[in-house]
């Protein structure tokens, strides 16, 4: 089926690419795609296109990659050119998903039907850059995707629709991301169909209560503080997969931990200092925490691959009594 509603799309990572693909496959014309500039990535630090750019180029869509859309910012000339391109590209609505650039009011006012954002949380909880990570880290029982009519605030726009999903005990940011991306893609296509049919999308202002902010994940957060309870550390490991990983330092070597679960403690574990390895078995490496203990079942040494505990221990022996370093506390 083909549609007449013209969609400018703005997004960057895989989460956004899933939405762009759904919009395109549903038959909506996409006259322009905005995405962030190519960035150095990988071991060779070669310039790599975003997931959104790769999809757009493969399907013959026009792509623009302005470093900013703010005339008063660091790149005023590039911003002015991009805004002019938006003004001169015939379209009806803009869809934004994990774009990574701020949209000033001038840009929000250009599309006839405004700008719709796909956000990976149940707003107003987890506004901001890392909603999936923070939901897992906080131990939330559920999360979801919210469509909102954008305004100049940080994820403060009126809500059009949401989809809720449970967070499973073994969910990581990677697994939860994929389910949320699929839900976001489905929601936005349904919303665009209604917008084309009805000419408008009713929206409800966000409640003032329940607002939390999902700060961007920093590499410095990767270090595991063994003084924390085991269940908190298990959530941190899951939240930081695939980035930046949970890091445990032993004799100066940073070992990444990719899968872990709290375990019941006995007297030996309870008396061990936080960070102490109390068992190194094929089933997992058990480490004493501030409260309880953590069984680590997937590890990665520097320069190596993710390995199950059995394979990791075969090449990098660990022993009871060794102790992971405790990070400095601010």
Curated annotation (Swiss-Prot):
Class of the enzyme per the UniProt entry, highest EC level: transferase
UniProt cross-references to InterPro entries, sorted A to Z: Fmt (IPR005794), Formyl_trans_C (IPR005793), Formyl_trans_C_sf (IPR037022), Formyl_transf_N (IPR002376), Formyl_transf_N_sf (IPR036477), Formyl_transferase-like_C_sf (IPR011034), GART_AS (IPR001555), Met-tRNA-FMT_C (IPR044135)
Annotated residues for binding of (6S)-5,6,7,8-tetrahydrofolate: 121-124
Catalysed reactions listed for this entry: L-methionyl-tRNA(fMet) + (6R)-10-formyltetrahydrofolate = N-formyl-L-methionyl-tRNA(fMet) + (6S)-5,6,7,8-tetrahydrofolate + H(+)
Single GO MF annotation: methionyl-tRNA formyltransferase activity
CDD domains: FMT_core_Met-tRNA-FMT_N (cd08646), Met_tRNA_FMT_C (cd08704)
Keyword Protein biosynthesis part of the UniProt annotation: yes
Enzyme Commission numbers on file: 2.1.2.9
Keyword list, A-Z: Protein biosynthesis, Transferase
A Pfam family annotated for this UniProt entry: Formyl_trans_C
Cellular component GO terms, alphabetical: cytosol
SUPFAM superfamilies linked to this entry: FMT C-terminal domain-like, Formyltransferase
PANTHER family reported for this sequence: METHIONYL-TRNA FORMYLTRANSFERASE, METHIONYL-TRNA FORMYLTRANSFERASE, MITOCHONDRIAL
Family, per entry: Belongs to the Fmt family.
Function, as annotated: Attaches a formyl group to the free amino group of methionyl-tRNA(fMet). The formyl group appears to play a dual role in the initiator identity of N-formylmethionyl-tRNA by promoting its recognition by IF2 and preventing the misappropriation of this tRNA by the elongation apparatus.
Protein name: Methionyl-tRNA formyltransferase
Organism: Burkholderia cenocepacia (strain HI2424)
Originating gene: fmt
